[in-house]
């Protein structure tokens, strides 16, 4: 899972993720927005879940983060499509709406994001 942190001309941090993990970048850009308290909450949940069978989720405005002891899933809240909503012959492209990754990989991105934010 490759990632890149950038600052736009206004100083806002933007996250770009490799193909297949784009939604993780969208989660940082839309939900985190430099809110380190949210990252604290996610890291605390990851520690609490380690070695357990429990799961945890944090629903945001645009994206929901779900986690268990091994895996993190980020999905767009609008992903709740039923088959009737799609025109015949059309497929919904969800690569930028759903992503799965390991907890350790996700926490590495969280730590790198936190470090980048604090480098001002």
From Swiss-Prot:
Pfam families: UPF0231 (PF06062). InterPro entries: UPF0231 (IPR008249). Belongs to the UPF0231 family. This is UPF0231 protein CKO_03249.
């Amino acid at each position: 899972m490759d990632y890149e942190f950038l600052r736009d001309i206004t100083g806002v941090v933007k996250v770009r993720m490799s193909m297949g993990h784009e939604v993780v970048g969208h989660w940082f850009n839309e939900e985190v927005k430099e809110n380190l308290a949210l990252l604290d909450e996610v890291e605390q949940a990851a520690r609490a879940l380690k070695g357990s069978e429990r799961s945890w989720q944090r629903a945001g405005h645009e994206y929901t983060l779900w986690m268990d002891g091994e895996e993190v899933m980020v999905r767009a809240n609008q992903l709740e499509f039923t088959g009737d909503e799609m025109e015949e012959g059309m497929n919904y492209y969800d690569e930028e709406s759903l992503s799965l990754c390991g907890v350790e990989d996700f926490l590495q991105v969280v730590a790198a994001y936190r470090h980048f934010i604090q480098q001002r």
